[in-house]
């Protein structure tokens, strides 16, 4: 292992010890915001600290066994010990390499899930509803909570657009590779000739950004409108102007929230979504400027970037970014996304490791 990597791992262990002490400090405990921030950092460093500890212990065990080899009575046993620990070192070093991949600070955050019908008319809206159900089922299996912020229902079912907040531990990190265009190939219920139609929906996953965290929005840049929330068929959900639409004038970004009966709650939720949209756009622009030449599995979230095809006649789902095809479409649409998401994360880790190796001269 390189000396520079050892030094970095020792520094991280020192920081972990420092955080452990800070989290026991009464002053830190009384400051909820600081306590949460430090707890998250402590949690992020715990695994890497434990693995590094095991690595150093294995090295010590090899040294001890090397000394034992000089005694004929223990030579064979010492050799076995050395070989076992060398194999363990390889395994632990692989784990450390993965753990050293720079983490997106937003990975542990809640996320906004936005699904919009694209080409395909009514069938695209129906498929938007199918995707929403798929993600809802997966969220339920993870113990996450989904809260719909706004929805525009399709005339024959599904959604022209649905925006929701997904709350839970590590939601954004788990779902961030879902942004892009999702294509469906199937025979619509309204198709009398049995022909397969192709439709598309777009999915966007945005990390929730803490409104109080280094985000400055000039109130003069906002236009806030209220209106009556409408359900399917234009029926009024309530008779007060509780729904809120906020427009960020400089960027033209528009957000809405209509699900709460309280205008105040709708405004707060719309504002949180606006902050996340603006911060995500800013980050995407920065990423584009600094990483034009490298492959990025996460993608830009560009709605024209086709990432996946759901083919119903063949019962398959294909993710085009990693050339993965799974013949279990029914299970996937019921929220069984574990194999798919794990595959995407493994590919991302492999990309990052290759990039780190290149940066470190192999």
From Swiss-Prot:
One of its GO terms (cellular component) is cytoplasm. Methylated by PrmC. Methylation increases the termination efficiency of RF1. It is found in: Cytoplasm. It holds the Pfam family RF-1. It comes from the Bacteria. The modification N5-methylglutamine is found at residue 235. Its main location: cytoplasm. NCBIfam families: prfA, PRK00591.1. Belongs to the prokaryotic/mitochondrial release factor family. HAMAP family: Rel_fac_1 (MF_00093). Peptide chain release factor 1 directs the termination of translation in response to the peptide chain termination codons UAG and UAA. This is Peptide chain release factor 1. It comes from Acinetobacter baumannii (strain ATCC 17978 / DSM 105126 / CIP 53.77 / LMG 1025 / NCDC KC755 / 5377).
């Amino acid at each position: 292992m390189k000396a520079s990597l050892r030094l970095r791992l020792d520094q991280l262990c020192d920081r972990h010890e420092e955080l452990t002490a800070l989290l026991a400090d009464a002053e830190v405990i009384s400051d909820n915001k600081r306590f949460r921030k430090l707890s998250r950092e402590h949690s992020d460093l715990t695994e890497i600290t434990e693995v590094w500890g095991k690595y150093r212990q294995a090295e010590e065990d090899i040294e001890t066994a090397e000394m034992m080899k000089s005694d004929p009575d223990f030579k064979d046993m010492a050799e076995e010990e050395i070989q076992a620990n060398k194999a363990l070192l390889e395994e632990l070093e692989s784990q450390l390499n993965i753990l050293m991949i720079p983490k997106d600070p937003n990975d542990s955050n809640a996320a906004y899930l936005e699904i919009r019908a694209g080409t395909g008319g009514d069938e695209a809206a129906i498929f938007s509803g199918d995707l929403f159900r798929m993600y809802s089922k997966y969220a339920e299996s993870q113990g996450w909570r989904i809260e719909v912020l706004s929805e525009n229902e399709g005339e024959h079912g599904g959604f022209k657009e649905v925006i929701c907040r997904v709350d839970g531990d590590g939601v954004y990190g788990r779902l961030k590779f879902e942004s892009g265009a999702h294509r469906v190939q199937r025979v619509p219920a309204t198709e009398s000739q049995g022909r397969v139609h192709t439709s598309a929906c777009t999915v966007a996953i945005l990390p929730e950004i803490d409104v109080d965290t280094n985000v400055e929005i000039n109130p003069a840049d906002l236009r806030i409108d209220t209106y009556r929330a409408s359900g399917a068929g234009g029926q009024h959900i309530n008779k007060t102007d509780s729904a809120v639409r906020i427009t960020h004038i400089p960027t033209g970004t528009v957000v809405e929230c209509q699900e709460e009966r309280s205008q105040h709650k709708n405004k707060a939720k719309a504002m949180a979504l606006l902050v996340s949209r603006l911060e995500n756009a800013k980050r995407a622009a920065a990423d584009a400027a600094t990483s034009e030449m490298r492959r990025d599995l996460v993608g830009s979230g560009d709605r024209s970037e086709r990432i996946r095809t759901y083919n119903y006649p063949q019962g398959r789902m294909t993710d085009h970014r990693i050339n993965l095809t799974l013949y279990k479409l029914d299970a996937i649409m019921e929220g069984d996304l574990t194999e798919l998401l794990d595959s995407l994360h493994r590919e991302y880790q492999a990309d990052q490791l290759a990039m780190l190796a290149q940066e470190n001269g192999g």
